[in-house]
Amino acid sequence: MSIDFTPDPQLYPFESRWFDSSRGRIHYVDEGTGPPILLCHGNPTWSFLYRDIIVALRDRFRCVAPDYLGFGLSERPSGFGYQIDEHARVIGEFVDHLGLDRYLSMGQDWGGPISMAVAVERADRVRGVVLGNTWFWPADTLAMKAFSRVMSSPPVQYAILRRNFFVERLIPAGTEHRPSSAVMAHYRAVQPNAAARRGVAEMPKQILAARPLLARLAREVPATLGTKPTLLIWGMKDVAFRPKTIIPRLSATFPDHVLVELPNAKHFIQEDAPDRIAAAIIERFG
């Protein structure tokens, strides 16, 4: 299944590019020149989430932002399970296809585990790490486990698939200022029906189901990436990834880190504070 949607060039002023992975066709943007930065989104977003950051960085960095299979403008292939390890393998293929070297790895939400799974297998090619409102270890709080179980229940799965619950409810709830109608239209347009939303519906299940991968990342990220220069950027009003719970663990994992707190940002920091994020990346790595 392909997505028939053309983004507004005023909001998304980028050329669409495509990569035929072993599992399906990936849409991505590749803007600017300079040191590469891989921008990995979460659920239920797509590369559109990074639009303002890309515009701010592309004079200094090569900004590479893929849409996972099942997200954004990428294909919804039959036979793809939309599990996190599958996404990571496809994005790994994509990184190798582009030949990214000495790249910055940025992830938010599920972009954290996916970007880290790619990076641990290519640690010698990773220049630095940028993480925001994310994690990469097995769910270890009652809140995360309960969220996964509730979102995996038949009534909520129905709401995700049939009523676009994640886009309609969680994006507005996860931003300090409700996105404009034009912005929300771009999130809706790439998840037009139940068949298109299978990837969105699977991700909350993966909080528990991806435990083997997350356990491996909990071991391998400190061992392979722990000495990399790191930027932690945190929306301090995020009720899902609470700073007091997660920042101490990330700080211990990456001793060479700089922490930037975004006091007025919630979960979707790229919507709430794109200029602050871009400035922090330039200051740390520019």
Curated annotation (Swiss-Prot):
Q: Does the keyword Phosphoprotein apply?
A: no
Task: Please name the catalytic residues of this protein.
Answer: D109 (nucleophile), D238 (proton donor), H267 (proton acceptor)
Keywords, A to Z, come to: Hydrolase
Query: One GO molecular function term?
Result: haloalkane dehalogenase activity
Q: What is its EC number?
A: 3.8.1.5
Catalyses: 1-haloalkane + H2O = a halide anion + a primary alcohol + H(+)
Pfam families from the UniProt entry? Abhydrolase_1
Residue intervals of the AB hydrolase-1 domain: 35-134
Q: What is its quaternary makeup? A: Monomer.
Q: Which family does it belong to?
A: Belongs to the haloalkane dehalogenase family. Type 1 subfamily.
Cross-referenced PANTHER family: AB HYDROLASE-1 DOMAIN-CONTAINING PROTEIN, HYDROLASE-RELATED
Q: What does this protein do?
A: Catalyzes hydrolytic cleavage of carbon-halogen bonds in halogenated aliphatic compounds, leading to the formation of the corresponding primary alcohols, halide ions and protons.
The protein here is known as Haloalkane dehalogenase 2
List the taxonomic lineage. Bacteria, Bacillati, Actinomycetota, Actinomycetes, Mycobacteriales
**Gene field:** dhmA2
